[in-house]
């Protein structure tokens, strides 16, 4: 943005690749834009909505994609009524955690006749009661009631990395859980960005962003 503003561009639209209203986009970014405007002069800025709108219960396009990815695992591995946990990274912000729970509820409705149950979990959490909203942790839910046998991890991650990628932190948590629970089998879905429908969701948010007010 700084380089473009220096070269005379005065109209910007930010398209967040975030499931929820990350502080990085909706708090830090406007502050950073103000600093750039002091250097380069005024310009117009819009920020498109995140991928998930908590205020619209009919906004289930992300959940539909995650459901498709779960179905792929069921079909490929020939699973019979597995349990599903929607797992995210974990967060210090309860508003971000609400996105996890919101999608888990939608996923449970979409898959109600295809899986045993759907429950949310987080990979990790900061210590302290004030962060207990992240519970249950993935390591706690694996091997627990209804999660003792075939469990699909619906991955609430945009793209692979040291957490969601092969051999990453979640892979290691699953491996440790399988050692503790001999009947447990775990299956990780593909990621949101790997589904062709993710482009349609981004395009929809782009168009919504064009209709928003300047900040």
Residue spans of the language-model regions?
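Extended amphipathic ligand-handling, pore-lining, and cofactor/metal-binding catalytic surfaces
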Residues: 1-215
């Amino acid at each position: 943005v700084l380089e473009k503003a220096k070269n005379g561009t005065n109209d910007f639209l930010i398209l967040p690749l975030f499931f929820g209203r990350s502080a990085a986009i909706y708090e830090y970014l406007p502050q950073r834009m103000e600093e750039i405007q002091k250097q380069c002069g005024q310009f117009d800025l819009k920020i498109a909505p995140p991928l998930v709108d908590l205020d619209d219960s009919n906004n289930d396009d992300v959940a539909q994609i995650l459901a498709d990815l779960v179905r792929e695992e069921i079909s490929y591995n020939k699973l019979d009524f597995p349990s599903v946990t929607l797992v995210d990274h974990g967060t210090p912000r309860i508003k971000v955690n609400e996105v996890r729970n919101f999608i888990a509820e939608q996923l449970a409705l979409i898959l109600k006749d295809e899986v045993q149950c759907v429950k949310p979990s987080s990979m990790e959490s900061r210590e302290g009661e004030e962060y207990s909203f992240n519970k249950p942790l993935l390591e706690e839910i694996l091997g627990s009631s209804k999660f003792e046998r075939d469990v699909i991890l619906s991955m609430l991650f945009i793209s692979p990395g040291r957490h969601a990628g092969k051999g990453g932190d979640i892979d290691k948590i699953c491996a440790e859980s399988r050692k503790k629970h001999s009947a447990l089998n775990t299956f990780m879905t593909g990621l949101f960005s790997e589904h062709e429908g993710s482009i349609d969701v981004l395009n929809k948010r782009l168009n919504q962003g064009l209709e928003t007010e300047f900040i």
